Curated annotation (Swiss-Prot):
Organism: Enterobacter sp. (strain 638)
NCBIfam families: aden_deam (TIGR01430), PRK09358.1-1 (NF006846)
Record function comment: Catalyzes the hydrolytic deamination of adenosine and 2-deoxyadenosine.
Gene for this chain: add
Record-given protein name: Adenosine deaminase
CDD domains, sorted: ADA
GO cellular component, one term: cytosol
Similarity comment: Belongs to the metallo-dependent hydrolases superfamily. Adenosine and AMP deaminases family. Adenosine deaminase subfamily.
InterPro entries reported in the protein's UniProt record: A_deaminase, A_deaminase_dom, Ado/ade_deaminase, Metal_Hydrolase
Catalytic activity: adenosine + H2O + H(+) = inosine + NH4(+); 2'-deoxyadenosine + H2O + H(+) = 2'-deoxyinosine + NH4(+)
GO molecular function: 2'-deoxyadenosine deaminase activity; adenosine deaminase activity; zinc ion binding
Gene Ontology biological process terms from the UniProt entry: adenosine catabolic process; hypoxanthine salvage; inosine biosynthetic process; nucleotide metabolic process; purine ribonucleoside monophosphate biosynthetic process
Chain positions recorded as substrate binding sites: 14, 16, 170, 279
Length: 332
């Protein structure tokens, strides 16, 4: 279902949610860390979703082993590099990798700014090696509170020229966007784009807040937007993109089934909705699965899938000239 004449993008992809099981095993051994299993086969159930989780917080716990083995800055550089290698293997032309430097740093008390630098370096090396274009989105992990998010913001600002956008992710219900107004004021002052996880665990009001108070240009997941007709109209009229992640929303029990997923409704309503992975290694999926398996099961027609692919570049955090250059590159 992928149109090979168009750029293939993944603009909602967590770098720290895409740490290979083999890499977790390798780093665990390298740093003599205690892992829940000693072989790759027995480790996978601990680091990958094998059945739908009851909620988002339970799903997020599957990510923890990936960051628990990041005992050095070089380990952070390695997983960033491997993220680009994975993107190339999936046939992606352009990827936006988002990461929470505080989350990656916390287990082994790494310097947050150093983690940011290591990720930048790994991505740069990967793009050069595998001929993939990438941009970085810094995440503030709301779950850890306002002060921790401020630390993340400071670490990202130290390398502001290498960061394209900032995001707010984590426990949406427990830590609403209203707690982070000053953080986003500074992010906008830095000239960054804004995307926010909203309407995943909380309702449409969380999406409104992300747009009106935090300045969101795009919304991560946003599945609850369908509950508010005025919001749907606003998203379409203002060209505020939705970063849809089909399989992820089922695995987190955010949506009961693919048939009930709102992506088809978004596209029918003229919302610039897209197809993305979210946390590929944890989910056990890739972008090809989302296009060829998940999207048809969600009721999307071939033309709607193509439109979602077009939208992926349309709402990417690239300049118009960069988008056109990518179109021409793929068209040959």
């Amino acid at each position: 279902m992928i149109d090979t004449r168009l750029p293939l993008t993944d603009i909602h992809r967590h770098l720290d949610g895409n740490i290979r099981a083999q890499t977790i095993l390798d780093l665990g051994r390298q740093f003599n860390l205690s892992l829940p299993a000693a072989t790759l086969e027995s480790l996978i159930p601990h680091v990958q979703v094998t059945a739908n989780e009851p909620d988002l917080v339970s799903f997020l716990s599957k990510l923890d082993w990936g960051v628990k083995v990041l005992a050095s800055l070089d380990a952070c550089r390695r997983v960033a590099f491997e993220n680009i290698e994975d993107a190339a293997r999936n046939g992606l032309h352009y990827v936006e990798l988002r990461f929470s430097p505080g989350y990656m740093a916390m287990t082994h008390n790494l310097p947050v700014e150093g983690v940011v630098e290591a990720v930048i370096e790994g991505v740069r090396e990967g793009c050069k090696a595998f001929n993939v274009q990438a941009r970085l989105i810094g995440i503030m992990s709301r779950t850890f509170g306002e002060s921790a998010c401020l630390q993340e913001l400071e670490g990202l600002l130290a390398h502001r020229d290498h960061i394209t956008a900032v995001d707010l992710a984590g426990d949406e219900l427990g830590f609403p966007g209203s707690l982070f107004l000053s953080h986003f004021n500074r992010a906008r002052d830095a000239g960054w784009h804004i995307t926010v996880h909203a309407g995943e665990a909380a309702g449409p009001e969380s999406i409104w807040q992300a747009i009106r108070e935090l300045g969101a240009e795009r919304i991560g997941h946003g599945v609850k937007a369908v509950e508010d007709r005025a919001l749907m109209d606003f998203l379409a009229e203002q060209r505020i993109g939705i970063e849809s992640c089909l399989t992820s929303n089922i695995q987190t029990s955010t949506v009961a089934s693919l048939v009930q997923h709102p992506l088809k409704t978004f596209l029918e309503h003229g919302v610039l909705a897209t197809l993305n992975t979210d946390d590929p290694a944890v989910q056990g999926v890739d972008i090809i699965h989302e296009y060829n398996v998940a999207a048809p099961q969600a009721g999307l027609s071939r033309e709607q899938i193509r439109q979602a692919q077009i939208n992926g570049l349309e709402i990417a955090f690239l300049t118009p000239s960069e988008k056109q250059a990518l179109r021409e590159l793929v068209a040959g």
